[in-house]
C-alpha cells in the first residue's frame, strides 16, 4: 500500500481529519494534487 493509499484509507474511514491529511503534504507523503483528490477541497 502506497502512502497515498494509506492516507486516503485513513481519511475515507474517518481515522484522519483534513488537518492530518494536510500535514501529509507538508511531510511529502502525498502531493497537493493528491490532497485535493482525497478531500475534494483545494490545498
Segments and roles (model prediction):
Residues 1-43:
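Viral virion structural and adsorption modules
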Amino acid at each position: 500500500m502506497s502512502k497515498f493509499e494509506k492516507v486516503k484509507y485513513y481519511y475515507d474511514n474517518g481515522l484522519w481529519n483534513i488537518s492530518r491529511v494536510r500535514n501529509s503534504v507538508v511531510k511529502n507523503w502525498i502531493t497537493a494534487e493528491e490532497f485535493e483528490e482525497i478531500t475534494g477541497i483545494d490545498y
